[in-house]
From Swiss-Prot:
Biological processes, Gene Ontology terms: regulation of DNA-templated transcription
GO CC terms: cytosol
The protein, known as: Uncharacterized protein MJ0241
InterPro entries xref list: ACT-like_dom_sf, ACT_dom, TR_Rrf2-type_CS, Tscrpt_reg_Rrf2, WH-like_DNA-bd_sf, WH_DNA-bd_sf
GO MF annotation terms: DNA-binding transcription factor activity
Chain ranges of the ACT domain: 78-145
Length: 145
């Protein structure tokens, strides 16, 4: 998924909360036309809307991630991770993956002595970014597919 054209312009203005009316004025668009685009972004989970006096629209964490990256792959990576077993290891790994916008769809953990082998299927992450994110926590990380 790439962020280009009008979608990119809209998302660039949504780093901070803003009303549809204010955003439409900035983009020189009719608010009703903009509202249609905002609803699509909301349905994709890229923006959140809030009604009322202090309402408006702004990017979600996922929307900010997509805008920053400019493109995400909707494919999955299967990872094999080897690490020294310790309390909180899996929580540490999964929270780091979550912080870079990854979504874990499958987890299998095997223990061999004082080491664990963890197999993860992860969506929405770049293979180099995930390796950099986990390098100080694990002994070895392999991309299986």
């Amino acid at each position: 998924m790439k962020v280009v054209g009008l979608t990119k312009k809209i998302m660039e203005h949504l780093k901070e909360p803003i009303t549809i009316k204010e955003l439409a004025k900035k983009l020189n668009m009719h608010p009703k036309n903009l509202d249609v685009k905002i609803r699509v972004l909301r349905d994709l989970g890229l923006v959140e809307t809030k009604k009322g006096r202090n309402g408006g629209v702004r990017l979600t964490k996922e929307g900010l991630y997509l805008l920053e990256k400019g493109e995400i792959t909707l494919g999955s990576l299967k990872l094999q991770i080897v690490a020294k077993d310790r309390i909180g290891l899996l929580a540490d790994i999964t929270s780091r993956i979550s912080k870079i916008g990854g979504n874990i769809t499958s987890t299998v953990l095997e223990r061999e002595g004082d080491e664990v082998i963890i197999y993860l299927v992860v969506e929405n992450v770049d293979k180099d970014e995930i390796k950099n994110t986990l390098e100080d926590v694990v002994e070895k990380i392999s991309i299986l597919w």
